[in-house]
């Protein structure tokens, strides 16, 4: 944990654990019962969260008189929502969820979540660049970003907004490339990318 977080003192809790795949002698099987083989490989997806975050969620649920049934890593939850409950799914894709402050990436191969990565560039980064480059308030820059394809937008303004977006997009693409480069345990990356 210290290697990933840079903090040896952080307490964490397992929040997700899911079977990704089972291979017997190199062949993928959905249920190993009844199979024989020399080489069994089981891949499991796990996600951990700092106890301070879990505690905050428990406190909010308690104050709202709600039961906290489960906590899930967001990219895992997004991928499960796409997959549904089909345990035999052969769905394969890279899911990129671009949020306000972060981008979460999940790699799904043959219905199994191979892993997830997150980096700190999201929609607000694009908005801040537009605001800075066009000397606008954050609120006005957000409106421009959301209405970039609107017919009433002047071509000169659209060109400036596009240029601002392109600057942040270059950095964002580098983040995607670095995140996907961390999947060195995956035989191949899916050729389909879905943006959420």
PLM feature spans:
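Nucleotide/phosphate-binding catalytic cleft detector across ATP-hydrolyzing
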Residues: 1-94, 112-114, 123, 147-155, ...
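Helix N-cap / loop-to-helix initiation motif
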Residues: 67, 135-137
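Small-residue helix-packing motif on alpha-helices
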Residues: 137, 141-144
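A short acidic Gly-Thr/Ser loop motif
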Residues: 88, 95-102, 108-111, 120-124, ...
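Residue-level detector of high-confidence beta-strand sites
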Residues: 116-118
